[in-house]
Regions:
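DPxDG-like acidic metal-binding loop motif
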Residues: 10, 39-65, 81
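Phosphate-handling active-site elements
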Residues: 19-28, 54-74, 201-203
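Conserved, helical-rich catalytic subdomain that frames metal- and/or nucleotide-binding sites
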Residues: 84, 89-185, 200-202
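N-terminal beta-alpha supersecondary unit
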Residues: 1-27, 38
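Glycine/threonine-rich beta-strand-loop-alpha-helix active-site module
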Residues: 60-101
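Short hydrophobic/aromatic beta-strand micro-patches
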Residues: 196-198
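Glycine-rich beta-strand-to-loop/alpha-helix junction loops that act as flexible
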Residues: 43-44, 188-193
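Short pre-catalytic strand/loop immediately N-terminal to key active-site residues, enriched for Gly-Thr
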Residues: 27-40, 182-186
Length: 203
């Protein structure tokens, strides 16, 4: 409700396809957002991906998944990932994707506090030279292949927490709450503020 249409990624996706593919017909788009904005859940990127796929099919453009990804990354770093299904290793700014084995079925509990976090602000204030701990990507991939969920969950980390959590200490409290209540791992999602816990069973 607070995003002008011309700044919405769905509008940008439609405009991009219109210009690149010389679409002359009009398209009516109704957007119902179920993922909160500025929540760290890639809601805008997933909407953008859906728009690219939908318009490609609706207008019979015949663009391949690779072509859609090439267009999508110009709109948002997460868009190529949202265009594809399954577990991926994402490198570069998000445009280099390597498919991984499916994760084991896990329960995920999301907590979205009444806070909105600007992704741009977080990346602008991220000090890469001060980050001393990085996730062991190869080890985590090995855990995925072996379905070692507990070790995988313990090894997860998010460097963006170094910016968002000092601004909103309640996120550290939420992580502790989730861990204290049975989560095998808890982490901030994306640039925040949504925090999630991973559980091996529903109870």
């Amino acid at each position: 409700d607070h995003i002008p249409p011309e700044k919405n990624l769905v509008w940008k996706a439609a405009k991009l396809l219109q210009e690149r593919c010389h679409i002359t017909d009009g398209i009516d788009i109704y957007l119902e957002k179920n993922i909160p904005a500025a929540a760290g859940l890639a809601g805008g990127s997933s909407d953008c991906a859906a728009a690219l796929i939908g318009i490609n099919e609706l207008c019979g453009l015949g663009l391949t998944l690779g072509q859609l990804c090439d267009l999508g990354v110009t709109l948002g770093a997460d868009v190529p990932f949202c265009l594809q299904k399954g577990t991926m290793l994402s490198e570069g700014i998000g445009e280099i994707l390597t498919r991984l084995p499916d994760l084991s079925p896990l329960w995920v509990l999301l907590i979205k506090p009444d806070i909105s976090v600007s992704t741009g602000y977080v990346y602008t204030h991220l000090k890469l030279d001060e980050i001393t701990s990085h996730p062991d990507t190869e080890h985590l991939i090995d855990c995925i292949r072996r379905h070692d969920d507990a070790t995988l969950a313990r090894g997860l980390s998010n460097v963006l927490e170094t910016v968002t959590i000092p601004e909103y200490p309640i996120l550290a409290e939420l992580k502790r709450f989730l861990s204290d209540n049975g989560a095998i791992g808890s982490l901030m999602s994306g640039s925040g503020p949504t925090t999630y816990g991973l559980y091996q069973d529903e109870s």
